[in-house]
Amino acid sequence: MADNKRIVLAYSGGLDTSVAISYLKERTGKDVVAVSLDVGQGGESLETIKQRALACGAVESYVVDARDEFANEYCMKALKANAMYEGVYPLVSAISRPLISKHLVRAAHQFGADTISHGCTGKGNDQVRFEVSIASIDPTLKAISPIRDLSLTRDVEIAFAKEHKLPITQTEKSPYSIDQNVWGRAIETGFLEDPWNGPTKDCYSYTDDPAFPPVEDEVVIEFKEGVPVKIDGRDVTPLQAIEEMNRRAGAQGVGRIDLIEDRLVGIKSRELYEAPGAVALITAHQELENCCLEREQHRIKRDIDKRWGELVYDAQWFSPATQSLNAFIEDTQKYVSGEIRMVLHGGRAVVTGRRSDSSLYDYKLATYDSGDTFDQKSSNGFIDIYGLPSRVAAARDVKFGNGIEVPKNTVE
């Protein structure tokens, strides 16, 4: 019979979560199952992380290479929604939390756990994202945070690791809090908490200095129904597309973001992000939508995209509202197929060409040269009807002395 007295821990392999394994067992009396996902963050192999978890006292270690799943089911949804929270942030961390939560719940069911633990503090967004996502999938599971709920501070961690002779090699602590995956990289805390302090070179890893770029890089990205399927004529999966654009756009310094952000928990925070692949792909996707979406559909989608980004940022990935928006966004993508040519250089991703069999751009209607098929005489009647409400309202304003004033002096 499965043991229902276990805790599933979101395990990164670092000091915090390595200490948390034994600390949770000691404080709660429950065995701990460590869960680790590869979402393209780089660093140590899953096997190395698995063995460390077991050496630190985990009774089971559940590891998953989720890179393709993350790219296909999460990054592509963000791409189709042109997701940019507050106009600039491509939801680097926010879209990974629902995927991690799904695997935490799966592990809880598999190993008979009744509690899920994460390593978030009590003032960040991720605690909400994990716990709301977990509750949305299985509301019977309890969620805890050792840092928030059990007073597991860094000083306690170091002392605990020494006392219990845990197999952890402590390296010099970075002054920053960093979260990264294939969609991008988030950097915060340390001296960046003073919003007047400019970022230093050591903040960045995914991008080179845009002030000293190599020769410009021209790239052609082909989309099929909103998803990148080819780069420069070569077939790519979503994961391969993101990885290649990370390399190429990152080399040009594309995707550096520095902003004061409105957090879900109500405070403002200073955040740095690097998302070269995400920024380049979203720029290309938006331009293809400009060609392929009907005007009113496009206007509505821009509003929907903004709201989608806010909902996902605010821990609502699994909510009914987000699912409804997903259905609308997916329907808009059936004609978003074609090619976008971009130049990557000096921190910018600039579209220089676009073509699509499903484009609504009609050269014969748009041209001012011979061959123009647009009947300009039709504009007279259109303007009469379109301007009718304004003329009627203006007549009323004049009647009541509220007409728009015009300059009385004559022009010499």
UniProtKB/Swiss-Prot annotation:
Catalytic activity, reaction form: L-citrulline + L-aspartate + ATP = 2-(N(omega)-L-arginino)succinate + AMP + diphosphate + H(+)
Highest rank taxon of the organism: Bacteria
InterPro entries attached to this UniProt entry: Arginosuc_syn_C (IPR048268), Arginosuc_syn_N (IPR048267), Arginosuc_synth (IPR001518), Arginosuc_synth_CS (IPR018223), Arginosuc_synth_type_1_subfam (IPR023434), AS_cat/multimer_dom_body (IPR024074), Rossmann-like_a/b/a_fold (IPR014729)
UniProt pathway: Amino-acid biosynthesis; L-arginine biosynthesis; L-arginine from L-ornithine and carbamoyl phosphate: step 2/3
Protein family per UniProt: Belongs to the argininosuccinate synthase family. Type 1 subfamily.
Protein name: Argininosuccinate synthase
Gene behind the chain: argG
Binding site for L-aspartate: 121, 125-126
